[in-house]
C-alpha cells in the first residue's frame, strides 16, 4: 500500500497525548544556529513518480554494471548466473525476512530451509555439522579463529600468506580484542608451504586458504598434519564456494573447521553485501560453534519438526559463557544459497565448477600468449594472478577506457608488497569467448 501521511488531527492528538504544544517543542535543546530553516540547498522540488524514475534511471546509467561488458573481477566476490527461480523463492512472503525463527510452532518452513542449508554446507565442505550461516566469509574466518582458541585454550593464531587480507583484518580485529596473538606470514602466491613450519606448541590454529587470494589451489593435508602434531587446529578458508564442486573440500584435507563465503551460489554481487558466511566443523567441536544451529526433533504427536538447538549465543546465556554474539544473520541469503544448490544438485554443481575452470584456462592461455604477460598462479580454479610489464593501475585504467573491467590490482589488497605490476583476474560461467577476445585485444594494444 502507498504511504498515507498523518492528518493535522492525527498530529494534534499525538501532541496532546505527550503534552507538547507543537513539533518545535521537540527541538528546544537544539541551538537556533544549528537549525535548518527553509529549503535544503540543491534539493529539487517534488515531482511525479514517473519523472523521479526517469531521473534515477539517468543517474544509474552512469554506472558500469558487471553485466554491461567484459568483466573479470573476483578477489572474493564473483559474478555468477543466478536462476530466476531463486529470486522467486526468496521473495515469497513466508521467507522475506531475516528475523530469527524463535517460535518453531509458526516457523517450520524457515527452520526446515535452514536445516537443509546446514546439510548442504556440511556436505559441500565434507564436515560433520554446519551452522545456520554467518554474516559473510570474513566473519566466519574470524569466528573460527576465536573458536579454536576456546577449544585449545591457546592464544596464538597463525594466518597464511595467501589468506585474503580482508579476512585477515576481520580476524585480527576480533581476535586481538579478546587478548589473542595473531601472526601474519609473508604474502605468498604459490601455496601454503611456510604455514606448516610456523606451527608450535603455543598455536591455537593455523588458517589456510584454498584457492587462496591469488587463486592458487593447495592441498592443506600437510598443514593439517603439522597442526595436529602440535595439538593445534586447522581452519580451512575459501572465498569461492563454487570451487568445492571440483577441488578437495576442507574435511578431506583434515581441516577441523571450514569457514568461507557462499555469495557465489544464489547471491549476486550486491555492491559487496549482504553475503552469507558458511561455517562447519567436526562434530566433537559443535558445542563451541558460533551462531545458530537448527536441529531435527519430533513434536508431542511424534511428527518430525525443526527447532533452534544448542543456543549458546549471548542472548540466551551469560556473555562470558557465550560462543558468539551474532545477531539476526544472513537467513535470506542462506535461503538463496539453498535454493540455488537444490536446483543444481551434486552433478549440476560439478558441471558449474567445470565451466568456471574451463573459462579460466581459456583466459589464462589467451592472456599468457600476450607478449610481456606472465601467469603467476601455478594451479588455479577460476582465478589467477598475472604480471604485466607496466604498472597494474595504469593497465586497468586503459582497459577500462576500452570497455573491459580487467580485474583487481594486487597492490590494492597488499599495499607496499612489491605487487604493483600484478593483477588478479577471474573468469566464471558468465565469461564468453568474446569477452576473452576483447580483453586480449585491448591488452595487446596497451602493452
Curated annotation (Swiss-Prot):
Keywords of the record: Oxidoreductase
EC number: 1.4.4.2
A GO molecular function held by the record: glycine dehydrogenase (decarboxylating) activity
Catalytic activity: N(6)-[(R)-lipoyl]-L-lysyl-[glycine-cleavage complex H protein] + glycine + H(+) = N(6)-[(R)-S(8)-aminomethyldihydrolipoyl]-L-lysyl-[glycine-cleavage complex H protein] + CO2
Claim: Nucleotide-binding is one of the keywords in the record: no
UniProt enzyme class: oxidoreductase
Domain of life according to the entry: Bacteria
Swiss-Prot/TrEMBL GO biological process terms: glycine decarboxylation via glycine cleavage system; nucleoside metabolic process
Any one Pfam family match given in the protein's UniProt record, by short name: GDC-P
Similarity annotation: Belongs to the GcvP family. N-terminal subunit subfamily.
Record text on subunit structure and interactions: The glycine cleavage system is composed of four proteins: P, T, L and H. In this organism, the P 'protein' is a heterodimer of two subunits.
NCBIfam families: PRK00451.1 (NF001696)
Functional description taken from the UniProt entry: The glycine cleavage system catalyzes the degradation of glycine. The P protein binds the alpha-amino group of glycine through its pyridoxal phosphate cofactor; CO(2) is released and the remaining methylamine moiety is then transferred to the lipoamide cofactor of the H protein.
Protein name stated in the entry: Probable glycine dehydrogenase (decarboxylating) subunit 1
Organism, as annotated: Hyphomonas neptunium (strain ATCC 15444)
